């Protein structure tokens, strides 16, 4: 099941381990009330909710201790209390019972992905997974994936200058990618044509990663058949596919509208507007999701742990997924308010990532 180490938790408040059962129960009720309503909760309501009968005065004493520990705080407009980010992190890591998905929820994702199958592109499968994920979690669903997951259809070399050519890669999904290539001196047009023919005979239906492996083997075996300049063009072309910058990754977002539900104040609206901007421009979001690529299971970033200003009032729950070779090729998950239903969202993200891995043969 999901693995969620604390991510850069502000130093855990001293004395956390010493919280007795009564304090934990009161704290749990404060968090669960917040997750359900978004509103501060007072001692009178807590005393009605907890299993052990306690007077509001006794509850207030415990709440004062929890506040001292940095787990809850009093918003200036209310006599009630809300959990702090450190409190939410403590709840998620130490107190929360991770739920399980219903069979209907599992089927919802599974049947949608099965209908896509291998007949369509990886992007189509991810798109379906995200649509289901955002629907089930009522949050925005995101995926960070390598563009190289696209299966190739065709490659062409177009000469720009005597020593520069454009490599045009066309994917089966219609995606076109252009890269400029430096050519060795004296390359004739015939070498570009020969290189195109050699590559097209071997790359169709393969991802960039698969094509690279295939071509390294093919070049070793078929070197004698190829003109030396053609070999250099092919080697340079293959090298141009292996860039590791963020342009080689794409961010797909579905369910933006879910972020507009249940906003409590104007500042909430302003925060969501900034988040929309960041999701649109990818600023920082790619880096954030990239931090989860080497995780073993689900990673959770709460509030300011996100390191991205617009996400400071949000939570991000993500999990890596892998391809047929077991190599991690992307991250998927959800972005939503800090009062996400963590117990429900964590297994849903975990399940979606496993299904996508299975679809890719991982």
Swiss-Prot record:
Provide one Gene Ontology biological process annotation: negative regulation of DNA-templated transcription
Q: Which domain of life is it from?
A: Bacteria
The answer to whether UniProt assigns keyword Transcription regulation to this entry is: yes
Q: What's a single GO MF annotation on this record?
A: DNA binding
Q: Which is an annotated Pfam family here?
A: HrcA
Matching InterPro entries:
GAF-like_dom_sf, HrcA, HrcA_C, WH-like_DNA-bd_sf, WH_DNA-bd_sf, WHTH_transcript_rep_HrcA_IDD
Q: Which UniProt keywords apply?
A: Repressor, Stress response, Transcription, Transcription regulation
Under NCBIfam families, the record lists: hrcA
Give the protein's function. Answer: Negative regulator of class I heat shock genes (grpE-dnaK-dnaJ and groELS operons). Prevents heat-shock induction of these operons.
HAMAP family membership:
HrcA
- What does the sequence similarity comment in the record state about its family? Belongs to the HrcA family.
Its recorded name reads Heat-inducible transcription repressor HrcA
Say which species the protein is native to: Bradyrhizobium sp. (strain BTAi1 / ATCC BAA-1182)
């Amino acid at each position: 099941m999901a693995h969620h180490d604390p991510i850069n938790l502000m130093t855990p408040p001293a004395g956390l381990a010493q919280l007795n059962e009564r304090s934990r129960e009161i704290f749990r009720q404060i968090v669960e009330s917040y997750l359900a309503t978004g509103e501060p909760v007072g001692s009178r309501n807590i005393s009605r909710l907890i299993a052990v009968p306690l007077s509001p005065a006794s509850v207030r004493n415990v709440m004062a201790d929890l506040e001292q520990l940095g787990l809850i705080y009093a918003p200036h407009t209310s006599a009630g209390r809300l959990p702090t980010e450190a409190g939410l992190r403590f709840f998620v890591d130490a107190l929360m019972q991770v739920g399980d998905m219903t069979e209907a929820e599992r089927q919802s994702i599974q049947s949608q992905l099965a209908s896509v199958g291998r007949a369509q592109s990886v992007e189509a499968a991810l798109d379906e997974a995200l649509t289901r994920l955002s629907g089930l979690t009522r949050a925005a669903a995101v995926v960070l994936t390598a563009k190289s997951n696209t299966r190739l259809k065709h490659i062409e070399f177009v000469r720009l200058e005597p020593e520069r050519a454009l490599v045009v890669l066309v994917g089966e999904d219609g995606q076109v990618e252009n890269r400029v290539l430096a050519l060795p001196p004296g390359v004739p047009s015939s070498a570009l044509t020969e290189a195109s023919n050699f590559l097209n005979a071997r790359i169709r239906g393969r991802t960039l990663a698969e094509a690279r492996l295939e071509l390294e083997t093919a070049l070793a075996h078929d070197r004698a058949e190829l003109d030396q300049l053609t070999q250099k063009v092919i080697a340079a072309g293959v090298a141009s596919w292996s860039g590791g910058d963020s342009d080689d990754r794409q961010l797909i977002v579905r369910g933006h509208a879910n972020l507009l539900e249940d906003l409590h104040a104007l500042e909430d609206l302003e925060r969501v507007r900034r988040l929309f901007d960041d999701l649109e421009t990818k600023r920082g979001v790619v880096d954030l999701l990239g931090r989860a690529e080497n995780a073993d299971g689900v990673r959770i970033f709460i509030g300011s742990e996100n390191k991205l200003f617009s996400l400071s009032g949000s939570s991000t729950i993500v999990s890596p997924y892998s391809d047929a070779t077991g190599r991690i090729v992307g991250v998927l998950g959800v972005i939503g308010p800090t009062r996400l239903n963590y117990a429900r969202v964590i297994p849903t993200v975990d399940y979606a990532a496993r299904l996508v891995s299975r679809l890719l043969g991982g």
